[in-house]
């Protein structure tokens, strides 16, 4: 028994050794094939070739496009997808190529879209205005051509348009109504045009899928090159914004007022341009959590503030060095936005209605009476001013120059009609608007007048002082004459 057991044990060991050797051979073969493939597959050679091909195709007009030229795109799409699957390639080195190739892919998608419109407009001319999206347009064409649509299969067509083409119910309704009038169902396409349409649909869908794959790849690595933008709006939206602009530096140059419209769908004739929130530019940024988690009433204000902060974050990321993931400013800006959004969404505080204050019993202002009339006389125009404001009919007004060199009209203040209107009558003059003098000032003025009179009398100008009495003049003469001189004078002439 022991010999049989030993024999079976030796067989098991031998079989195990053979299996292990076969596994090792298979692994070595796989490694050699992978090494051969990596040696042949160089992404930094394929990417410039793909960029050059996409650039040349983008310059061709849709009328002159041929399928032999578009057929070269498919192998390049396969190579680009292989590059995206390799994780060992440095993302920083690949990013400049992706920034250059993303706009070219978009232009090629637009080229294929226009090519499809030029081919299919003979059969359904209104379709391009009803379905503006290139991907939905190609899917609708494939549904209409492959499903053999007839009037009895309207339910089946509705199902395919909703699930495969991802159309809304409003779009489907408008499309079915337009098909009854402008869709030429009885005029099928020829074989050549049909094959061109199918191949163009395939290329357009592959380009669209490649664009989405590149966007997802950049979203997975976006925190390396744009940490602040990624922190504010999330990796997916940050990747869409940067991919649309073509790089972080290009995105930082876009003004904040234009960021909201990036990724916005074209307006359709049957759709409303604004929703309840009042926002017209519903692009990539409008779908971020910083806007959607708050009430609809503050969406418009939050979108404007978020665009400003995203623009600042992009400039910060563009100025940082590679590998620097400093998000201090993004944390600060996000906290500010959250605080402002909470303040905007709060209900207004109910202010208590205050009662009117109790009226104070004060004496009312007087508008008449003797004192009030005397008070108003202070501000009344003088009689000369009133005459200056009047003009004599048929005569030229006399004017004088003031200190500033401007002419001032004298009116009737310097005419012979003063006498006629009573200019010199003292009874009509009012002293109400004259300056009021204090007792001290009156005393000082009277003393000054008295001194002036005495000085004039001493000079012999008594004739010009009619108010002085003769007694005062004789008294003043006696004070200022010398009696000795008088006696000498009489004695000398005696």
Swiss-Prot record:
One of its GO terms (molecular function) is RNA binding. GO terms for biological process: mRNA splicing, via spliceosome; spliceosomal snRNP assembly; spliceosomal tri-snRNP complex assembly. Disulfide bonds: none annotated. The record marks 257 as: Interaction with U4 snRNA. Keywords: Coiled coil, mRNA processing, mRNA splicing, Nucleus, Ribonucleoprotein, RNA-binding, Spliceosome. The keyword Ribonucleoprotein applies. It holds the Pfam family Nop. Component of the U4/U6-U5 tri-snRNP complex composed of the U4, U6 and U5 snRNAs and at least PRP3, PRP4, PRP6, PRP8, PRP18, PRP31, PRP38, SNU13, SNU23, SNU66, SNU114, SPP381, SMB1, SMD1, SMD2, SMD3, SMX2, SMX3, LSM2, LSM3, LSM4, LSM5, LSM6, LSM7, LSM8, BRR2 and DIB1. Interacts with the snRNP via the Nop domain. This is Pre-mRNA-processing factor 31. It comes from Saccharomyces cerevisiae (strain ATCC 204508 / S288c) (Baker's yeast).
């Amino acid at each position: 028994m022991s010999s049989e057991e030993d024999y079976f044990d030796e067989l098991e060991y031998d079989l195990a050794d053979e299996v292990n050797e076969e596994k090792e051979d298979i692994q070595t073969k796989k490694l050699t094939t992978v090494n051969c493939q990596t040696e042949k597959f160089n992404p930094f050679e394929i990417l410039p070739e793909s960029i050059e091909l996409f650039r040349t195709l983008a310059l061709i007009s849709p009328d002159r496009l041929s399928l032999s030229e578009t057929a070269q795109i498919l192998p390049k799409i396969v190579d680009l997808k292989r590059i995206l699957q390799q994780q060992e390639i440095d993302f920083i080195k690949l990013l400049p190529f992706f920034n250059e190739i993303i706009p070219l892919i978009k232009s090629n998608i637009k080229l294929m879209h226009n090519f499809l419109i030029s081919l299919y407009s003979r059969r359904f001319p209104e379709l391009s205005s009803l379905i503006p999206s290139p991907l939905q347009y190609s899917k609708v064409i494939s549904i209409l051509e492959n499903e053999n649509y007839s009037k009895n299969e309207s339910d089946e067509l509705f199902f395919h348009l909703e699930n495969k083409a991802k159309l809304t119910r409003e779009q489907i309704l408008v499309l079915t109504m337009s098909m009854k009038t402008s869709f030429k169902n009885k005029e099928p396409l020829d074989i050549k045009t049909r094959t061109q349409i199918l191949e163009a649909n395939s290329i357009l869908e592959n380009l669209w899928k490649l664009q989405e794959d590149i966007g997802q790849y950049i979203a997975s690595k976006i925190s390396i090159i744009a940490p602040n933008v990624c922190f504010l709006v999330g990796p997916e939206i940050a990747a869409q914004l940067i991919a649309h602009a073509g790089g972080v530096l290009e995105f930082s140059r876009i003004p904040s007022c234009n960021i909201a419209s990036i990724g916005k769908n074209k307006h359709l004739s049957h759709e409303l341009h604004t929703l309840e929130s009042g926002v017209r530019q519903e692009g990539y940024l409008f779908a971020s959590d910083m806007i959607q988690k708050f009430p609809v009433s503050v969406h418009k204000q939050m979108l404007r503030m978020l665009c400003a902060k995203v623009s600042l974050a992009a400039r910060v990321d563009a100025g940082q060095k590679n590998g620097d993931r400093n998000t201090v400013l993004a944390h600060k800006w996000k906290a500010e936005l959250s605080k402002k959004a909470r303040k905007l969404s709060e209900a207004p505080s109910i202010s208590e209605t205050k009662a009117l204050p109790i009226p104070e019993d004060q004496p009312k202002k007087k508008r008449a009476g003797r004192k009030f009339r005397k008070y108003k006389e202070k501000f009344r125009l003088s009689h000369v001013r009133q005459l200056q404001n009047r003009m004599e009919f048929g005569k030229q007004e006399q004017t004088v120059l003031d200190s500033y060199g401007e002419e001032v009209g004298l009116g009737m203040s310097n005419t012979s009609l003063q006498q006629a209107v009573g200019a010199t009558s003292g009874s009509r003059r009012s002293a109400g608007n004259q300056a009021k003098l204090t007792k001290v000032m009156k005393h000082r003025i009277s003393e000054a007048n008295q001194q002036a009179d005495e000085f004039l009398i001493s000079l012999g100008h008594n004739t010009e002082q009619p108010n002085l009495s003769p007694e005062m003049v004789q008294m003043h003469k006696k004070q200022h004459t010398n009696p000795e001189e008088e006696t000498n004078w009489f004695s000398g002439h005696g």
